[in-house]
């Protein structure tokens, strides 16, 4: 196993979550999955491991990242781009016919109708020819691949960011468009012939659950199996660090590894890898020092300017998915909780929130807090 802190891991570098991959694969036999959690907890690594497993079971699997998409056509473009190489595979049955049909659908994608921000219910035609509603074209794309013999897994990364982009860029109809997107996914897709051949793994580093609750559309995701990635147990985290140390010939006892886990406090693989990276660097600079004597310095390096970008990113996500006022409230509560390693009691957080919200009643503050 290699010391990789940041990039998704595969093969021998994937450690400690084999049982989770097996459980997700089992769920996908009958249900679609919503996998949410902050950045750097291994969602992409797990999703790709699931893709590998279902392929071994005879499925086809594609991955699309929609974080850069600002509208529904962007989603369709990503879907088409991911399908093209998969359908050009020589092992695909009737690939030529399906590929030709996909090409025709690609031309339709260029002319789908999407709402024009600020224009109310009016749409805009993109490209030449008659414009269609994007949901019709999307449904035809999915129906096309469902005609093939194999089952399909479509892994969509950062879908919540696309939906937040719709709302941010279209203050007039953005919420309606998000509702339509999620209704299409829940109802239209499931109603397609052979829909059982299509399974979806949706992931994101911002809260889709938060978005739908805020806008009164929680029902749109109730058909998804909600899953998360818990941190490693102490035993698994220690085993990972000891294996890493063996790879790099660094003397590290189980006790030393346990001290690292205790210092990290939230032993997600990334933070263990990042701490080990800094520990390796310090050992290289101080070859006579023991690993145990350098653990505290390695932890300090995690939060030094330039190395703490991931923590700033979390703060940015709050601003992205919450209103300015609610994001400020959230930061205030986090600052209060961070004063003590054991956190803060809900009553203390609620009292601080009531003070910040001024004229709000206790019940209004409680609803915001929840």
Show the residue positions of the predicted features:
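Walker A/P-loop-proximal flanking segment of P-loop NTPase domains
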Residues: 1-54
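Conserved catalytic network of the ASCE P-loop NTPase/AAA+ motor domain
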Residues: 26-27, 54-57, 143-149, 189-196, ...
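P-loop NTPase nucleotide-binding core
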Residues: 31-41, 45-171, 363-367
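Conserved nucleotide-binding/hydrolysis micro-motifs of P-loop NTPases
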Residues: 68-71, 160-161, 205-210, 233-237, ...
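Sensor-1/coupling segment of RecA-like P-loop NTPase cores
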Residues: 146-155, 161-163, 171-215
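A short helix-turn-beta junction within AAA+ P-loop NTPase domains corresponding to the substrate/partner-engaging
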Residues: 214-231
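Conserved small helical "lid"/interfacial subdomain of P-loop NTPases
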Residues: 228-256, 275
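Winged-helix-like regulatory helical subdomains adjacent to P-loop NTPase cores
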Residues: 254, 263-364
């Amino acid at each position: 196993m290699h010391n990789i802190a940041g990039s998704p891991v595969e093969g021998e570098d994937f450690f400690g979550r084999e049982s989770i991959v097996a459980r997700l694969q089992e769920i996908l036999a009958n249900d679609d999955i919503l996998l949410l959690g902050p950045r750097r907890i291994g969602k992409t690594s797990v999703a790709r491991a699931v893709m590998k497993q279902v392929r071994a079971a005879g499925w086809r699997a594609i991955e699309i990242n929609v974080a850069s998409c600002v509208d529904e056509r962007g989603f369709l473009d990503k879907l088409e781009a991911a399908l093209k190489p998969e359908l050009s595979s020589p092992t695909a049955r009737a690939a030529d016919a399906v590929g030709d049909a996909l090409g025709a659908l690609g031309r339709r994608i260029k002319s789908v109708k999407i709402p024009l921000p600020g224009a109310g219910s009016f749409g805009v035609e993109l490209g030449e020819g008659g414009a269609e509603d994007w949901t019709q074209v999307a449904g035809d794309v999915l129906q096309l691949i469902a005609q093939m013999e194999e089952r399909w897994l479509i892994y969509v990364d950062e879908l919540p960011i696309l939906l937040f982009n719709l709302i941010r860029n279209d203050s007039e109809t953005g919420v309606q468009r998000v509702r339509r997107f999620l209704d299409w996914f829940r109802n239209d897709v499931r109603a397609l012939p052979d829909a059982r051949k299509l399974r979806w793994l949706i992931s994101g580093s911002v809260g889709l659950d938060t978005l739908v609750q805020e806008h009164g559309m929680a029902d749109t995701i109730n058909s998804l199996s909600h899953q998360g990635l818990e941190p490693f147990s102490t035993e698994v985290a220690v085993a990972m660090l000891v294996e890493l140390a063996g790879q790099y010939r660094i003397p590290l006892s189980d006790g030393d590894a346990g001290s690292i886990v205790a210092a990290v406090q939230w032993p997600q693989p990334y933070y263990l890898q990042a701490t080990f990276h800094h520990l390796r660097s310090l050992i290289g600079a101080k070859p006579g020092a023991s690993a145990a004597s350098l653990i505290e310095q390695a932890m300090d390096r995690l939060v030094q300017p330039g190395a703490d970008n991931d923590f700033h990113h979390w703060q940015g996500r709050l601003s992205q998915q919450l209103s300015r006022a609610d994001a400020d409230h959230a930061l205030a509560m986090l600052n209060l909780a961070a004063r003590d390693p054991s956190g803060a009691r809900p009553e203390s957080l609620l009292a601080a929130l009531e003070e910040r919200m001024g004229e709000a009643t206790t019940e209004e503050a409680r609803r915001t807090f929840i």
